[in-house]
Amino acid sequence: LESIRDIPFGTFVIDAGWYLPENCGWCNATGDWEQSRTLFPRGIKAAADMIRAQGMHAGLWFEFEVAGRDSKAFSAQDMLLARDGVPLTSKNRRFFDLRKPAVQAYVQEKMCDFLRENGFEYVKIDYNDNIGMGCDGAESLGEGGRQIAEESLRWLDRLKSSVPGIVIEN
């Protein structure tokens, strides 16, 4: 950070991989959202504090709707979207069912509370996959898909309420 101090960056974003366990790649580790103590031995809050001390806004990457194959969340079938009773899987990812109260509590803790408690003022939210033609849990697959899209938008509102003033990039 010292080396870029005089460059007029407004925001410094810690990108994908901040949660990286030592045994897998960043893409397959999404979903558990536990900060890496290897990458951030003093904790990610210390990194955010250092960013702000250099006069920049601290930002963090999230893809809050998915669980990668190597995460514990990938196997938490009661929290995941399904189609025809089978967890909806796209390559190495599954999707959280954002309609469920347990998932809402999980995302609140892992994303919203985490961002607020660690002093992040900016979040970069990727949506690198999609659920296709829909999911179970409604009168049709399409209606299930519509409900999930609507719930994703509600999460942006929840995020703004949980972290006042946060800038959201998508």
Residue ranges and their predicted role:
Residues C24-G25, E63, R69-A73:
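Short, solvent-exposed loop/turn and secondary-structure capping segments
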Residues V13, W18-L39:
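N-terminal substrate-binding region of glycoside hydrolase catalytic domains
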Residues S36-Q54, F74-N170:
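Active-site neighborhood of glycoside hydrolase catalytic domains
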Residues E2-P21, E117-G119:
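Catalytic domains of carbohydrate-active enzymes, especially glycoside hydrolases
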Residues G10-I14, A58-F62, V123-I125, E169-N170:
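Hydrophobic faces of well-ordered beta-strands that scaffold small-molecule active sites
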Residues L20-P21, A67-G68, L80-G85:
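Non-catalytic terminal segments and appended small domains
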Residues F12, A16-Y19, E63-A67, N128-N130:
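Active-site beta-loop-alpha junctions enriched in small/polar residues
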Residues E22, D70, G132-G134:
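Extracytoplasmic/secreted cell-surface and envelope-processing proteins
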